[in-house]
A protein has these predicted regions:
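Binuclear metal-dependent hydrolase catalytic cores
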Residues: 1-104
């Protein structure tokens, strides 16, 4: 299994020279199995960088949201594959309530 960290920061992204060594994006990881299946964990600002990894990937994209705090979802609007009409995206929400389920 391969794990790529695209973002590990807290509440807000912090780009700049002071964070270039460890990165400044909010949470986003991509897990890739030995048979090339991919799972995205969280949709923080690192998801924008992960978009490049999914350009040639034609299988359904699976996104697991650990929870719905802003720093774990704020990269979603910048994830290029969501704008591709034929792209299949499966989203697994974190812990939800009935109100969350209705909103989603």
């Amino acid at each position: 299994m391969k794990i790529t960290f695209y973002g590990v920061r807290g509440s807000i992204p912090t780009p700049g020279k002071d964070t270039s060594r460890y990165g400044g994006n909010t949470p986003c990881l991509v897990l890739e199995s030995e048979d090339n299946q991919k799972l995205i964990l969280d949709a923080g600002t690192g998801l924008r960088l992960a978009s490049k990894e999914f350009k040639q990937y034609q299988a359904p994209i699976h996104l697991l949201l650990s929870h719905h705090h802003w720093d774990h979802i704020q990269g979603f609007p910048f994830f290029d594959p969501i704008f591709e009409a034929k792209r299949q995206l499966v989203i697994y929400p974190g812990h939800t309530t009935e109100a969350h389920d209705t909103a989603i």
